[in-house]
Amino acid sequence: MFGYKCNLQTDTEVITYIFDYLVRVQGLTLGEAASVVAAPFWSTIANKTDMEDKEKHTYLRTLFPSLLVTGPFSIVLGYNGGLMALNDRLKLRSMVVGEKDNKVYIASEEAAIRVMEPNVENIWAPAGGEPVIVNVKEGCF
């Protein structure tokens, strides 16, 4: 599909190629690509009051319908300058995010974050299909 050849034949490989195609080839932002892969339901789009947001999501769902990933997934995607975490739009796979100082922790459950940072200050569970985009400052690590 789109010139990619899946060698491993795993969902991880397919999702990686989808993001490469959307971001690198098509020029979408990470947030827009997330809105394709874990697209809001048509009823959710129809109920949006922000017309610009409504038109954007309608456009993306119409233009890239075959790139919607309908099964359960929770991914962390690295890119030059940071990372993005995303789970499926139904939240069939859990994902929790925590923050402490200038660090961000992402795991499938809060307990895993607390093992890494017992005094984590801000913990939340993003909604299904809500991307968490973390930009890393140059020279931090």
Descriptions of predicted regions:
Residues 1-141:
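Conserved short alpha-helical segments that host acidic/polar catalytic motifs at enzyme active sites
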